[in-house]
């Protein structure tokens, strides 16, 4: 089985997240994408973070009709902060050695990868897939520690969309840089719209929008602007 791991705060999960998951699954030939909501993201301030159980439930509702998308509560049920190394080890035990893990991560987050807990070990446990992010260039990877030398012209070709992916040796699993269509949807923008009472304009799955309104999420402090 080829399993994509998509972690995040999903605060809230939105149509952009779903599009990224489906596009990555198709581009990489994955059997399934596993959404992994974080309980306490170690690299983000709590700010306007909704309760973990609410964020989990919103993801569950969002993917309910798509069997190619699944959800794990591995980080929700674990006490303390959510570190990727712990999550990957637990998922390896759960799914077994026959499952190949693909760690999907945005370019913005991957630039901080050397500061993560046990980054070198992570590179031995799963294959990293770095996804394009609006406003960021893949050629910035040329200065990231721990990475193999990737030819800058190839990174520039990826930025210019002359190619759609690059594969490079990294750890025992390898690295994939994948250019996806840009998404204009932002969780922080959605939270702002909710606080201001603005319509969602098809930014959220209907079930998620209903859940937010029913449980009065993201409305407690209309002056808060944390992203």
Per-segment meaning from a language model:
Residues 1-227:
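Nucleotidyltransferase catalytic core that binds NTPs
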């Amino acid at each position: 089985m080829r399993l994509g791991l998509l972690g995040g705060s999903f605060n809230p999960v939105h149509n952009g997240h779903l599009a990224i998951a489906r596009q990555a699954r198709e581009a990489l030939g994955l059997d399934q994408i596993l959404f992994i909501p974080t309980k306490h993201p170690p690299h983000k301030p709590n700010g306007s973070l909704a309760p973990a159980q609410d964020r989990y439930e919103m993801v569950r509702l969002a993917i309910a009709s798509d069997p190619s998308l699944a959800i794990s509560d591995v980080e929700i049920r674990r006490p303390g902060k959510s570190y990727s190394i712990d999550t990957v080890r637990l998922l390896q035990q759960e799914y077994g050695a026959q499952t190949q893990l693909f760690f999907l991560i945005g370019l913005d987050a991957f630039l901080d990868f050397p500061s993560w807990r046990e980054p070198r070990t992570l590179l031995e446990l799963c294959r990293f897939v770095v996804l394009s992010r609006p406003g960021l260039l893949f050629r910035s990877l040329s200065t990231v520690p721990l990475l193999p030398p990737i030819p800058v012209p190839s990174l520039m070709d990826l930025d210019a969309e002359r190619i759609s992916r690059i594969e490079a040796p990294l750890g025992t699993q390898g690295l994939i840089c994948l250019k996806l269509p840009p998404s204009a949807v932002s969780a922080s923008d959605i939270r702002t719209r909710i606080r201001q009472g603005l319509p969602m304009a098809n930014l959220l799955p209907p079930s998620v929008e209903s859940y937010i309104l029913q449980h009065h999420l993201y409305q407690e402090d209309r002056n808060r602007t944390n992203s």
